[in-house]
Amino acid sequence: TTIKLILDIIKKDSGSIRILGRDCTSATTILKEEIGVVLDEVGFQECLTPLQIGRIMKDIFHNWDPSLYDQYLQKFNLPNKKEFGKFSKGMKMKLGIAVALSHHPKLLILDEATSGLDPVMRDEILDIFNDFTRDESHAILISSHIVSDLEKICDYVAFLHKGNLVLFEEKDRLLEKYGIIQCTKEQLQELDQSAVIGVKYSSYNVEAVVLRDQIPEGFKVHPISIEDLFIFMIKGVH
């Protein structure tokens, strides 16, 4: 929903949306020049080839870079004369990424942009996204269920659950802030319960995500991943 609102696909009920310092509704044309978009379903016509798509994009975007587009087609091993409808899901996603990057956007909006890719190609794509954000004037807004991807490229993480913003914080701060401990039920009760984020019970022990600065001495603290944190927050009993 957030991405659809930003792209003006659906209308907001209230409030305002600002992208790159501009109100989305009053600067649509300018913003479209500065935003690259990759949705989970890449929507080019089935009969078009990458070569034809490139020609169309040249008429749409003032900053379209044919040379850069060709480089991405070669990098992704995409045949420029094959019809889009005959591409696999992964090939379609790679073409969408090539198009999104080839008009020199300042902001990339990615909705499940690495889904359908094999692990090696996904890692290469993430490297490209990391290169993109090395320019401090560039940013990426990514929505993904592949949480490991978020850990690799994101500076800030927002977690939406059932339409509510559960968490928004700097990624590195989150990883420093929380830890996982294993203990008994009795030891768990001795902890400050306000510092316990989520708990998983097994027949042998208890796993809990706890604020690191509230963990007493004597507990072995294991590092946490963003995925672990999300799972404990939603599924862990608290």
Each model region followed by its residue ranges:
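Conserved ABC transporter NBD signature motif
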Residues: G15-S26, I30-L31
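Helix N-cap at the start of a conserved alpha-helix in ABC-type nucleotide-binding domains
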Residues: P119-M121
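ABC-family P-loop ATPase nucleotide-binding domains
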Residues: E33, L39-L95
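Catalytic Walker B motif of ABC-type/P-loop ATPase nucleotide-binding domains
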Residues: L108-E112, L117
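C-terminal coupling/interaction segments
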Residues: I197-H238
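Helix-to-loop junction immediately C-terminal to a conserved catalytic motif
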Residues: L7
